């Protein structure tokens, strides 16, 4: 995107300074959401570091979601990329700067991914599940490119660069732990997500459905996925 400039010099915000050709994105995973985001992540193998390049010119003009292109994705990659998309949505939703419009995108993503990830994993050729996963990843991409992500991604990028752990796998492991560490700061948004998608129900029906209880239920559902 910029001649004779190392990736490290483009790492960060708005450093490309160049108009790019028409960019069309056709995702084959669900996923990174890169078909609607302003970010590119490039691993420097020499120093084991992941450079994040962010610029508005990197947002594709058009995105084509074809479920048939993801039906051959292996189960492990389906799981990892699906949890990456889930993490995008949850972290964006919990961000205090997330607007109501972006919350709606994130909520839709969580609902779609939560309802379809296991089906896509178990039934790779299920085009309905694959399409719902692509749509969920797309919605999550819109949400986090506007509201950003949090500590889960910050830690996962470091681990991935140093130890070559698949990004989605790192996110899947870290997401419930980081959300639990946030404590009461995220009870309210997680409770709203749980009320909307009802991924799990408290086993003890006598327990009052407080924000804390619902947030705990949502975190447990992420572990069970």
Region roles according to the model:
Residues 1-68:
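Glycine/threonine-rich beta-strand-loop-alpha-helix active-site module
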Residues 31, 138-171:
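Glycine-rich phosphate/pyrophosphate-binding beta-alpha loops
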Residues 36, 87, 93, 98, ...:
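Glycine-rich flexible loops
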Residues 39-147:
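Carboxylate- and glycine-rich phosphate/diphosphate-binding segment that chelates Mg2+/Mn2+
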Residues 104-108, 112, 132-135, 154-157, ...:
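Amphipathic alpha-helical interaction segments
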Residues 162-222:
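Gly/Pro-rich interdomain helix-loop hinge
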